[in-house]
Structures are given as structure tokens and as C-alpha cells.
UniProtKB/Swiss-Prot annotation:
One of its GO terms (biological process) is protein refolding. This is Heat shock cognate 71 kDa protein. Molecular chaperone implicated in a wide variety of cellular processes, including protection of the proteome from stress, folding and transport of newly synthesized polypeptides, chaperone-mediated autophagy, activation of proteolysis of misfolded proteins and the formation and dissociation of protein complexes. Plays a pivotal role in the protein quality control system, ensuring the correct folding of proteins, the re-folding of misfolded proteins and controlling the targeting of proteins for subsequent degradation. GO terms for molecular function: ATP binding; ATP hydrolysis activity; ATP-dependent protein folding chaperone; heat shock protein binding; protein folding chaperone; protein-macromolecule adaptor activity. Its main location: cytoplasm. ADP binds at residues 14-15, 202, 268, 271, 275, 339.
Length: 649
């Protein structure tokens, strides 16, 4: 395949989306199911790995081996409170590997564990394939988005996931900034406007304030919560119904993973219904121990269950306004992004906060982020299209960055909401006489003491010549690149000795070797997926060929055109093959192909004879079926064996 353009990928907690900029406009690309967003789900079964819709459709049957929300684990520690509380809601197993979380699943009959970055990389691979199928070209360059409030390790984890999936990540950009690009281009903003992006998705929440003027997008401030979204609203509803079930039936379903998963699917559906109706009913047959669960929930009750979470979305709005030094009256446009902004109560709270100002719903909340990422990908690849060539993006770093100085004090070198890329240098000195070295510990966060902030990494600068305290001059430089990822260096001015680290967050990061290993594993898994797909395709081909052959020779219209002996010969062979198929569903591709050849050996001469005697196609024969045509081989890329029928609660 020839080389395709760079794409923009919105790697979401619950859904992902991919877009490409070509012929002067953005195309959001639909997947093989015709959906423009793809669930960020990866499932492992006895025979195969499923990604996207296929994985989500079978989650009720296979809850413990279906991984979702990998984003919520990316770049976090196992003991992180967030990880611990999420684990209570997930049916799959999360294990502690050297204080890093890994998900544990059964795949092809063995136990396997994956880093969250690997799971995210599988979702990215799927998005890459969706783009390649549409473009008919290979895709290797991408811009990937992260929540604006993501810290350094979460950004780095996303970049690693891209590398593992075989993508060259041009840049990591913030979701609300990407959405602002979509808005700015859509609205053709000319004169300066202050725009507030309110982005509430499935797993994270961001508020960013930008000034847009003639193609320059300048982020003034950003705030948010990387752990608040639609999933949390679902959790509240699930807990509410578990309690109701206990009350009505005196049984606790919370330990039954399949029951909880079916309930969650129903809750997610009910939540969506409540955005347009004031009541939703839930009907789940035989939810637990044969008990049917029929109930309903009103919009008012749903709002009450989530009252604190909904109201809490206004805190980051206030913080972003304060940091941007703006009054709410100075905001020209309030733009809604992310599926959860469809919730009427959230819209009402936001509108009331801005004194009744109309909210802007002109951009598609599910696709805006991928749209903006695709535009940025085109710019970085040098697209000369007039609508994008003058576009300039000035983003900011969301958290203050600094080092620990005497007494555990956080000394900030780069304040939050500083435009990136940026570089700051500050000179420090020693704390005691003849101190031979200094330990440089790098932190991010807003608290005065480092113990309350997040340690990103540390390194030592040694070999400082003996001198009284306060004499040596150690120059520390923080350098943040366009991805929002930081390099730190320290130099002793007297000797010129230097030491530096890229903050690869030793605690939460994959080493280069890890990543290389995972890249190879990803290729191996992909090859296995392809083998499985070919196998299913060969099996389906054989099956449809056998059945078509049968129905062809049994056709009334062929009476007298084919001898009973020939007819019986074909029927016997077809029945033999169909019987073999029933017993050998898991055979290898070669075996299916061998059976097909054997069957064709019997059928082809008879069918050819039939053609010649009939002078062409006999009437009523399914056109072009018999002969060497391997039945209705599943289209390559079909993934699963025909449509999976899902249980709809």
C-alpha cells in the first residue's frame, strides 16, 4: 500500500474516533460497523482478540476478559486512590507489578497480563486500521489527544501507546484545544473571541479558555479532573439499582460480575434515554438467580444521584476563569464537547452560571476532538490548504513544575498555564559546607510542600568541588516540548559538569526495552488476529460453498438436466463436508481449504458438464456460486465470524 496522510486520533476513555484532513476538509472515518466512534474496549477469548464494537458486544458473556477504561490506568501507580476505587467497578482483574498496575486476562487458555499502555496501543492499532481501510493507504503518522489536565506521566504513557501500535506520534495535543480548532474553523472566527471549551466525556473532564483570532488559537488557562465523566454517572446508577435489588429481593448481586455488567449496560442506555425523556425503564430478564429485574428511573432521581458530581463541574470553570484573569462576562462563546454534555442538568448548571447565556452546540461533541487533531496532523505534515496553513496553536502546561529545596519546599520554575514549548532556568546553591553533590527532585502540582505534589523523577549532580555553603552555583533548566513532556538538566557553573534527565517518570514509565518488546508483541498479536480471520474466512467459505452446491443440485429447475447419480454424488459429498464441519469448527485454515478442494474435485466436472449441456447458465442457478468460488468468504478485516448477536437488556 502507498503511504497515506497523517491522521488525528481522539483516544478516549470509553470511545475513540479518527479523522483525516484531505481535499481541504476533515473526514471523520467510520469503522467496519459504520460507526464514527469506536468503543475503547479490548476483549480476549479462547480463540481470538477483539477490539472495538466486537469487544463491547460480547462484554456481558465475557466480562472478566474484556478490558475497558485503560486510559484511567495509563501513567498511574497501583496504589493511587483512583486506581483502587476504579478496581471496585471493573470486572477484569488488575494486578500490582512493581507498584505499576497491569490487567490480567485469560487469552487462548492461558493467563496473560498487559500494561495499560499495551491495551491503549491495541485501541490505537484499531483506529489506525480503520483509517487505512478508508484511505486504502498505510497510515504511520498521527496526532493523538489527551485530556488537557493530564500530567506528564499520562502524556508519556499515551505517546508510548502510540509507539507500540506502530504509529509515529507527531505530537500529543490537549482535547479541548483540538475541539477549539474544530470550533474556530467551523465558525470562521475572525475578530478576537474568548472561547470556553467545556469538555466532559466518558472518563475525563476539562475546561479550557482560549482566545481565537485570525487562525491563532492561544490557550489562556486550563483546569479539570482527569477522573470525572459519564462512567462515574453510570456507577452511581448501578449502585442505586444494586441497593434496590437488595431491598426488593434480599439478594446482593455485586459479586456476580456478569449480572453487574448487564446492569451497567442497561444503566448506560437508561442514562442516554434520560437526556431526551424524563423517565427510563430498565428490563433485564433473569438478572440474578433467575430473578427478572424490571424497574424504572426518573430524570430527577438520576440528577439527584449525581448532584455533587454535576455541581462539581463548575469548580474547574471558576478556576480556569481565575487563572485566565477573566470575568465570566468576558467569555464570548461556551462550547460543549464530549458525550456527557448532552445531560440536560449539566447544560442548565453551566447556563445558569453564565447568567442564562446560550451554550454553543454547533460542533459534534463526539467528533470535535478528532476533527481538531486531524487538522493539526495536516499542518504538521505540511498541508498547504488555505484554510489551515495560517493556523497557529499556542497551548499551555496544566500543572506547575518545580524542584524540592531545603525543608521540602516546592520551588516553582514553570507556573501552570505557561505557554509551551518553554524553557526556564534558575540558579540554586548548596545547603551545607563542602557538600559534594545535590539531589534534584522534580515535582508537579500546586501545593507549597513537595510531599503534597507528584514526584516526576530525580537525579544527582555530583563532583561539586568543596566550598562553603551558598558558594557553588547550580543552574537548573526545565525545558518543556510541544507534547507537554519535560527535560530537566543541572549544571555546576564552576566545573561545567552537567547531568540531565528526560522526565520519564521512573515510577510510572516503560523503559525503551519494554517499549521495543511491546512493539514486537503487538505485531505478533496482529499476525495471530490475521490468521484467525483467514481461518474464519476459509471456514465460512467452505460452509457456504457446500450449502450452495446442495441447493443448486436440489433445485427443481434442474430436473432432467443432471443425472440422479451425479446429483447423489454431489449431495453425499456435501453432506460429508457439512458433517465434518460440525465436528471441526476449530480446524486450521489449510484443513478447510483442503476440504474445499476435495469438494470442488467432485462438483466441478459435474457442474461443467451441466453448463455445456445447458448452453450456458442453467436458469435459477445462483449466479457464479459453484465452481472454484470459495463461497462467501468473509471480507478481509471482518474480524469476527459473521455478525455477533448481542444480548440487549
Amino acid at each position: 500500500m502507498s503511504k497515506g496522510p497523517a491522521v488525528g486520533i481522539d483516544l478516549g476513555t470509553t470511545y475513540s474516533c479518527v479523522g483525516v484532513f484531505q481535499h481541504g476538509k476533515v473526514e471523520i472515518i467510520a469503522n467496519d460497523q459504520g460507526n464514527r466512534t469506536t468503543p475503547s474496549y479490548v476483549a480476549f477469548t479462547d480463540t481470538e482478540r477483539l477490539i472495538g464494537d466486537a469487544a463491547k458486544n460480547q462484554v456481558a458473556m465475557n466480562p472478566t476478559n474484556t478490558v475497558l477504561d485503560a486510559n484511567r490506568l495509563n501513567g498511574r501507580q497501583f496504589d493511587d486512590g483512583v486506581v483502587q476505587s476504579d478496581m471496585k467497578h471493573w470486572p477484569f482483574n488488575v494486578i500490582n507489578d512493581n507498584s505499576r498496575p497491569k490487567v490480567q486476562v485469560e487469552y487462548k487458555g492461558e493467563s496473560k497480563s498487559f500494561y495499560p499502555e499495551e491495551i491503549s496501543s491495541m485501541v490505537l492499532t484499531k483506529m489506525k486500521e480503520i483509517a487505512e481501510a478508508y484511505l486504502g493507504k498505510t497510515v504511520s503518522n498521527a496526532v493523538i489527544t489527551v485530556p488537557a489536565y493530564s500530567n506528564d506521566s499520562q502524556r508519556q504513557a499515551t505517546k508510548d501507546a502510540g509507539t507500540i501500535s506502530g504509529l509515529n506520534v507527531l505530537v500529543i495535543i490537549n482535547e479541548p484545544t483540538a475541539a477549539a480548532i474544530a470550533y474556530g474553523l467551523d465558525k470562521k472566527v475572525g475578530a478576537e473571541r474568548n472561547v470556553l471549551i467545556f469538555d466532559l466525556g466518558g472518563g475525563s473532564f476539562d475546561v479550557s479558555i482560549l482566545t481565537i483570532e485570525d487562525g491563532i488559537f492561544e490557550v489562556k488557562s486550563t483546569a479539570g479532573d482527569t477522573h470525572l465523566g459519564g462512567e462515574d454517572f453510570d456507577n452511581r446508577m448501578v449502585n442505586h439499582f444494586i441497593t434496590e435489588f437488595k431491598r426488593k429481593h434480599k439478594k446482593d448481586i455485586s459479586d456476580n460480575k456478569r449480572a453487574v455488567r448487564r446492569l451497567r449496560t442497561a444503566c448506560e442506555r437508561a442514562k442516554r434515554t434520560l437526556s431526551s425523556s424524563t423517565q427510563a425503564s430498565i428490563e433485564i430478564d433473569s438478572l440474578y438467580e433467575g430473578i427478572d429485574f424490571y424497574t424504572s428511573i426518573t430524570r430527577a432521581r438520576f440528577e439527584e444521584l449525581n448532584a455533587d458530581l454535576f455541581r462539581g463541574t463548575l469548580d474547574p470553570v471558576e478556576k480556569a476563569l481565575r487563572d485566565a484573569k477573566m470575568d465570566k462576562a468576558q467569555i464570548h462563546d461556551i462550547v460543549l464537547v464530549g458525550g456527557s454534555t448532552r445531560i440536560p442538568k449539566i447544560q442548565k448548571l453551566l447556563q445558569d452560571y453564565f447568567n442564562g447565556k446560550e451554550l454553543n452546540k454547533s460542533i459534534n461533541p463526539d467528533e470535535a476532538v478528532a476533527y481538531g487533531a486531524a487538522v493539526q496532523a495536516a499542518i504538521l505534515s505540511g498541508d498547504k490548504s488555505e484554510n489551515v496553513q495560517d493556523l497557529l496553536l499556542l497551548d499551555v502546561t496544566p500543572l506547575s513544575l518545580g524542584i524540592e529545596t531545603a525543608g521540602g519546599v516546592m520551588t516553582v520554575l514553570i507556573k501552570r498555564n505557561t505557554t509551551i514549548p518553554t524553557k526556564q532556568t534558575q540558579t540554586f546553591t548548596t545547603y551545607s559546607d563542602n557538600q559534594p553533590g545535590v539531589l534534584i527532585q522534580v515535582y508537579e502540582g500546586e501545593r507549597a510542600m513537595t510531599k503534597d505534589n507528584n514526584l516526576l523523577g530525580k537525579f544527582e549532580l555530583t563532583g561539586i568541588p568543596p566550598a562553603p555553603r551558598g558558594v557553588p552555583q547550580i543552574e537548573v533548566t526545565f525545558d518543556i516540548d510541544a507534547n507537554g513532556i519535560m527535560n530537566v538538566s543541572a549544571v555546576d557553573k564552576s566545573t561545567g559538569k552537567e547531568n540531565k534527565i528526560t522526565i520519564t517518570n521512573d515510577k510510572g514509565r516503560l523503559s525503551k526495552e519494554d517499549i521495543e518488546r511491546m512493539v514486537q508483541e503487538a505485531e505478533k498479536y496482529k499476525a495471530e488476529d490475521d490468521v484467525q480471520r483467514d481461518k474464519v474466512s476459509a471456514k465460512n467459505g467452505l460452509e457456504s460453498y457446500a450449502f450452495n452446491m446442495k441447493s443448486t443440485v436440489e433445485d427443481e429447475k434442474l430436473k432432467g438436466k443432471i443425472s440422479d447419480e451425479d446429483k447423489q454424488k454431489i449431495l453425499d459429498k456435501c453432506n460429508e463436508v457439512i458433517g465434518w464441519l460440525d465436528k471441526n469448527q476449530t480446524a486450521e485454515r489449510e484443513e478447510f481449504e483442503h476440504q474445499q478442494k476435495e469438494l470442488e474435485k467432485v462438483c466441478n466436472p459435474i457442474i461443467t458438464k451441466l453448463y455445456q449441456s445447458a448452453g450456458g447458465m442453467p436458469g435459477g442457478m445462483p449466479e457464479g456460486m459453484p465452481g472454484g468460488f470459495p463461497g462467501a468468504g468473509a471480507a478481509p478485516g471482518g474480524g469476527s465470524s459473521g455478525p455477533t448477536i448481542e444480548e440487549v437488556d
